[in-house]
Structure formats: structure tokens, C-alpha cells
């Protein structure tokens, strides 16, 4: 259980190649007091990735063991690899008043919303399927058959957009980044958030009348 002054939880989801990871990294650079939750995964490390920064890379046996121990608030199998979000990682940050952003897929987002009803969810979509395919090809991480599989799955994933609170079209990266930042800032300024955070100031101002 988190306190009234706890941090906010944000979910950012998108089809593979939608740009959510780049947008989340930009958000962390632009906004203070917010951190990305590092997920556990059984997939191999990609070039440029770092252990404990991009993911915690573990084998399937370790992953299943953590599932059985209840270590994950959500977990899902995506493209034959497991991904999971640690309960402890989220709650520790929220309890210290730090905002947490989750870079996950729609399946994980669904599980997170059940556990954290106040979480703010954002779905990122590409300007077109052609643009999405081009991004997947430009990453040079997957073979043609894997890209085709990702494109087929993307069309199914896009159908889940109504389940989210906000929708951002990632056509212009800088514009999309500003829109994501605006969502975070606006949520921080909601009355129920500010009433707790600014309780002393409000009490002083009202008692001075």
C-alpha cells in the first residue's frame, strides 16, 4: 500500500517498432522525479543494451521461479520470450514519491491496470503500417520472417487502443515526446494530487483569510 504522497504510475505501450522505448527514454531526460521500471526478460541481450539498465536478462528457469514466488506484478510471453515487471521495484519507488513509467505491451498494461487502478496509460501508434514496417527494418535486429510476424501481431495490438487513457501518434518524434511529457505534468497537477502535496501551503493560505 502506498501513501497519499506516493508517486504516480504511468504505462506506455505500443506495437513493436512503435517507438515507445525511445519516447520513454526522452521522457526521463525531460522530466524530473520519474524513473523507468526495468523489466526482467528471457530474450537475448541486443547490441548496445546493458544489464540492469535496459532489462534484467535471466534464463527461463529463473523467470518461472520468480513467477512462482509472486515476484512479478505482470508477466507475458511475447515473440517466444518472457517479460515481467517486478512488484518490489514499482512499490519501492512509489512509496518514496517517485513517479514510475512502465514500457510494456498491451497484455502487461491490462494486468497493471487491475493491480493499480490509478495508473495512467498511454498508447503509442505509428502514422501508418508502412512507417511501422520501415522502423522495424531500420532497427536491423530481426530477420524478414520475424518482421512479418511482428507486423501481423501489430494489427492485433492496435485494436486494443480503446483500453488506454491517452493516444499519441508517433509521426514527429519531438512532438510525440512533448505530448507524453504534457500527460505526465498534467496528471501531477490534478487536484487530488496537489491537495496532498501542497497541504501545508493550502492550510496556511486558507487560515490567513
Curated annotation (Swiss-Prot):
Role summary: Essential for recycling GMP and indirectly, cGMP.
Family: Belongs to the guanylate kinase family.
Organism expressing this protein natively: Legionella pneumophila (strain Lens)
Keyword terms, alphabetized: ATP-binding, Cytoplasm, Kinase, Nucleotide-binding, Transferase
Designated name of the protein: Guanylate kinase
Ranges where the Guanylate kinase-like domain occurs: 7-185
Listed SUPFAM superfamilies: P-loop containing nucleoside triphosphate hydrolases (SSF52540)
Gene name of this polypeptide: gmk
Binding-site residues for ATP, renumbered to this chain: 14-21
Amino acid at each position: 500500500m502506498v501513501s497519499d504522497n506516493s508517486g504516480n504510475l504511468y504505462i506506455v505501450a505500443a506495437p513493436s517498432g512503435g517507438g515507445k522505448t525511445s519516447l520513454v527514454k526522452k521522457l526521463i531526460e525531460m522530466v524530473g522525479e520519474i524513473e523507468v521500471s526495468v523489466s526482467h526478460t528471457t530474450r537475448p541481450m541486443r547490441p548496445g543494451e546493458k544489464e540492469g539498465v535496459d532489462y534484467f536478462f535471466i534464463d527461463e528457469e529463473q523467470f518461472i521461479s520468480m513467477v512462482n514466488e509472486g515476484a512479478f506484478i505482470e508477466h507475458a510471453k511475447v515473440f517466444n520470450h518472457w517479460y515481467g515487471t517486478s512488484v518490489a521495484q514499482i512499490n519501492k519507488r512509489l512509496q518514496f514519491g517517485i513517479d514510475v513509467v512502465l514500457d510494456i505491451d498491451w497484455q502487461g498494461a491490462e494486468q497493471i491496470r487491475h493491480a493499480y487502478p490509478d495508473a495512467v496509460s498511454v498508447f503509442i501508434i505509428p502514422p501508418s503500417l508502412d512507417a511501422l514496417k520501415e522502423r522495424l527494418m531500420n532497427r536491423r535486429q530481426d530477420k524478414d520472417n520475424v518482421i512479418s510476424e511482428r507486423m501481423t501481431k501489430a494489427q492485433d495490438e492496435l485494436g486494443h487502443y480503446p483500453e488506454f487513457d491517452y493516444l499519441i501518434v508517433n509521426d514527429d518524434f519531438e512532438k510525440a515526446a512533448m505530448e507524453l511529457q504534457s500527460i505526465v505534468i498534467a496528471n501531477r497537477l490534478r487536484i487530488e494530487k496537489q491537495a496532498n502535496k501542497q497541504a501545508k501551503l493550502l492550510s496556511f493560505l486558507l487560515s490567513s483569510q
